[in-house]
Amino acid sequence: MAQQLTDSLFTIRDWLRYSVSRLEESGVFFGHGTDNAYDESVWLVMSALHLPLDTLDNFLDARITKEEAKHLAHLIERRVTERVPTAYLLREAWLKGFKFYVDERVI
């Protein structure tokens, strides 16, 4: 079912909207770097695509490759079903503009 839903997502804008909806409906806890579904979705989608977080507007309508779509779907699904914090999924956390490596041993 999730595969059919994500087959119709083509742009970063599409994936961002999908991620926000999935995070909101799942009731996951925010607090490992963000405090809401939108900010966490921007972080997850942009970082997973290796794009700077502050360039979202430039890439909103950029099309996603099939491999990128699989990767995003996997990360979002793990976030909502396994409740894995985005910081662990991405192996990164931010503090005052500096990126740090994190995993389950850190936070």
Please identify what each model-predicted range represents:
Residues 1-51:
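Non-catalytic accessory regions of SAM-dependent methyltransferases
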